[in-house]
UniProtKB/Swiss-Prot annotation:
InterPro entries to which the protein is assigned, alphabetical: Leu-rich_rpt, LRR_dom_sf, RU2A, U2A'_phosphoprotein32A_C
Organism: Mus musculus
Protein name as it appears in the record: U2 small nuclear ribonucleoprotein A'
Residues found modified as Phosphoserine: 178, 197, 236, 255
PTM annotation (N6-acetyllysine): residues: 172
Site of covalent link Glycyl lysine isopeptide (Lys-Gly) (interchain with G-Cter in SUMO2): 172, 221
Swiss-Prot/TrEMBL LRR repeat ranges: 20-41, 43-64, 65-86, 89-110
This protein's UniProt keywords: Acetylation, Isopeptide bond, Leucine-rich repeat, mRNA processing, mRNA splicing, Nucleus, Phosphoprotein, Repeat, Ribonucleoprotein, RNA-binding, Spliceosome, Ubl conjugation
Length: 255
């Protein structure tokens, strides 16, 4: 493992990404703890912490400029309190493929008032009953959850389920937090699917090149790694009418 130092931050790749944001690339260093980010001097719109060994999402200084945080493929099992004090403008948070287990572990995200794009895919918590409605109720500012746009009907269902004394008790009952973390506990054990063909790989690469948000780029990279092809993902069902719906539930545009 590598300690995140001011020297590492200075040496890491820094560039203007596909959506014209200034990005700091800290992926793949096996960093265990987020620290020393004051050395960035708040000069970045996006920071990529993918493919590290981070267990807790905290340790941020005040970063007013930061809008996008990519933390997929880590070991995150806890989310620190008071993230809004450090990251007041965070709009995109990608936590795909981590170790979040309990619904209550997601509660600190409610403080991030600017958060509109959130991915918690491939975390054990997504298998919990009422997972999606719970997140929609607790973090109502999120417009896109797990690359699926939040529908008006879902907001109404979440409000109905968790409102009042009975709803508050239900939320309390299902929202216990993790007390301990056992490495590997609760993680999926499914066998990997076969890889895509050369033509499929090219199709995904083209889709990545045309992506309009970092979140969409990360989703497409995940498809490439898992052998899925854009346009062949399983649909969640027929679309219902509503002011927050789009024709295709899978979000491909950050607008």
């Amino acid at each position: 493992m590598v300690k995140l130092t001011a020297e590492l931050i200075e040496q890491a790749a820094q560039y203007t990404n596909a959506v014209r944001d200034r990005e700091l690339d800290l992926r793949g260093y096996k960093i265990p703890v987020i620290e020393n980010l004051g050395a960035t001097l708040d000069q970045f719109d996006a920071i990529d912490f993918s493919d590290n060994e981070i267990r807790k999402l905290d340790g941020f200084p005040l970063l007013r400029r930061l809008k996008t945080l990519l933390v997929n493929n880590n070991r995150i099992c806890r989310i620190g309190e008071g993230l809004d004090q450090a990251l007041p403008c965070l709009t995109e948070l990608i936590l795909t493929n981590n170790s979040l287990v309990e619904l209550g572990d997601l509660d600190p995200l409610a403080s991030l008032k600017s958060l509109t794009y959130l991915s918690i895919l491939r975390n054990p918590v997504t298998n919990k009953k009422h997972y999606r409605l719970y997140v929609i109720y607790k973090v109502p500012q999120v417009r896109v959850l797990d690359f699926q746009k939040v529908k008006l009907k879902e907001r109404q269902e979440a409000e109905k389920m968790f409102k009042g004394k009975r709803g508050a008790q239900l939320a309390k009952d299902i929202a216990r937090r993790s007390k301990t973390f056992n490495p590997g506990a609760g993680l999926p054990t499914d066998k990997k699917k076969g890889g895509p063909s050369a033509g499929d790989v090219e199709a995904i690469k083209n889709a990545i090149a045309n992506a309009s948000t970092l979140a969409e780029v990360e989703r497409l990279k995940g498809l490439l790694q898992s052998g899925q092809i854009p346009g062949r993902e399983r649909r969640s069902g027929p679309s219902d009418e509503g002011e927050e719906e789009i024709e295709d539930d899978t979000v491909t545009n950050g607008s």
